[in-house]
Amino acid sequence: MSFVPYSLPELPYDYDALEPVISSEIMILHHQKHHQIYINNLNAALKRLDAAETQQNLNELIALEPALRFNGGGHINHSLFWETLAPIDQGGGQPPKHELLSLIERFWGTMDNFLKKLIEVAAGVQGSGWAWLGFCPAKQELVLQATANQDPLEPLTGKLPLLGVDVWEHAYYLQYKNVRMDYLKAFPQIINWGHIENRFSEIISSK
């Protein structure tokens, strides 16, 4: 086996740190079970891919694409998701500053209006998926966009993800039941804008 298997990243906070917005029960299941399953399935697909490449089995290589896209996307999306959240008493919900705030105000007028639009995009996801704040390097602009299932933003659109809102039911159902909007309205309280600003600065400086 020539590939290095992926592993579950540690959370930068305790499982109960995002309460009352997200319960510890949800966080444990979401991280230890759901994210881990994506990683397990991704590694299994990569092992098959490694064998298929060795055997030059083109049919198998093509057949593996859906599993790589779904489980690889699940790992990419969740790894970013954990990093862009923070407990309320550790800066969660504190608005961004500097260039990122200026760009948000340029495209959406105010921070409050941006959050309203973000919630609208997330609420509009049919079934399971993600709502994203992304940066388009080609146009040097911020965008709000949804992706279905576990489709990752960057490989499919060329836009770089800054913030992702998980609107799969496993992200909220145990606490909010079928009222997705209550989850979305509470979500801005735990956005880690400090981390997102750092990520944005790294993107800008590398282009």
Swiss-Prot record:
Catalytic function, reaction form: 2 superoxide + 2 H(+) = H2O2 + O2
Keyword hit for Metal-binding: yes
Keyword line: Manganese, Metal-binding, Oxidoreductase
Q: Share what the entry says about its subunit structure, partners included.
A: Homodimer.
| Documented EC number(s) | 1.15.1.1
Bound how, and how many: what does the cofactor note say? Binds 1 Mn(2+) ion per subunit.
Role of this protein = Destroys superoxide anion radicals which are normally produced within the cells and which are toxic to biological systems.
What PANTHER family would the database entry show? SUPEROXIDE DISMUTASE 2, SUPEROXIDE DISMUTASE [MN], MITOCHONDRIAL
Per the record's keyword annotation, is Oxidoreductase included, yes or no? yes
Q: What class of enzyme is it?
A: oxidoreductase
The region annotated as signal peptide is none
Q: Which gene encodes it?
A: sodA
Q: Which cofactor does it need?
A: Mn(2+)
Full protein name:
Superoxide dismutase [Mn]
What Gene Ontology terms describe what this protein does at the molecular function level? manganese ion binding; superoxide dismutase activity
Binding site residues for Mn(2+): 30, 78, 166, 170
Entry's Gene3D superfamilies? Answer: Fe,Mn superoxide dismutase (SOD) domain (1.10.287.990), Iron/manganese superoxide dismutase, C-terminal domain (3.55.40.20)
PROSITE patterns the record matches: SOD_MN (PS00088)
Q: What family does the entry list?
A: Belongs to the iron/manganese superoxide dismutase family.
